[in-house]
């Protein structure tokens, strides 16, 4: 008999890095570290609020048709719907062009396409390096709206914006140079 295996836990807290890179030379099946740390990429790990949507999926379960003699019915895995949803990020309506306070707002012009790239399991402040693994989500940015984020005295001005997942994700792909 094979003994059960219990993998070690991987902490999530402060180990969730998100980078946006516009459509262009980036390849989700051969992700380039140089592109992800380059001038066209934007690390949004500390711009997106915790309330932002994360990529998700929902898979339908279809039931087999019952036959006259069946006492049971069974399920099939059906269609899967993938989405990202509404992200919320910091914004200063009085911010100077190209400043940190408006970088996400300027980068995510409605209609912009690119990839949200996620690295998990390593401190978010640690730089990306060759050999680390990332998951890439192709996406398109929807319209932007100024909204409050938080409550009462602690509220901040934010932008809420829908991101659509436009293709299949690439999970756990090693970063290349």
Spell out what each predicted region is.
Residues 11, 32-33, 113, 117, ...:
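Generic N-terminal initiation segments characterized by hydrophobic and/or small/turn-forming residues
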Residues 2-88, 141-157:
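Solvent-exposed edge beta-strands and adjacent loop segments
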Residues 65-127:
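Structured, beta-strand-rich domain cores
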Residues 19, 47-48, 73-75, 107, ...:
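Intrinsic disorder/low-structure terminal segments
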Residues 29, 35-36, 164-177:
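Compositionally biased, intrinsically disordered linkers/stalks adjacent to structured regions
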């Amino acid at each position: 008999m094979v003994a059960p295996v219990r993998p070690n836990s991987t902490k999530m807290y402060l180990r969730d890095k998100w980078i946006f890179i516009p459509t262009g030379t980036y390849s989700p099946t051969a992700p380039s570290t140089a592109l992800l740390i380059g001038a066209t990429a934007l690390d949004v790990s500390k711009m997106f609020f915790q309330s932002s949507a994360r990529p998700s999926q929902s898979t339908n379960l279809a039931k087999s048709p019952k036959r006259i003699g069946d006492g049971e019915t069974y399920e099939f895995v059906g269609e899967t719907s993938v989405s990202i949803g509404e992200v919320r990020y910091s914004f200063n309506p009085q911010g100077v062009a190209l400043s940190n306070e408006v970088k996400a707002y300027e980068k995510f012009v409605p209609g912009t396409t690119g990839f949200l790239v996620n690295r998990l399991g390593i401190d978010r402040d640690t730089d990306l390096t060759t050999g680390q693994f990332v998951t890439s989500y192709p996406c398109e940015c929807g319209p932007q709206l100024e909204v409050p984020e938080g409550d009462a005295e602690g509220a901040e001005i934010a932008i809420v914006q829908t991101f659509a997942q436009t293709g299949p994700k690439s999970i756990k792909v090693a970063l290349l140079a």
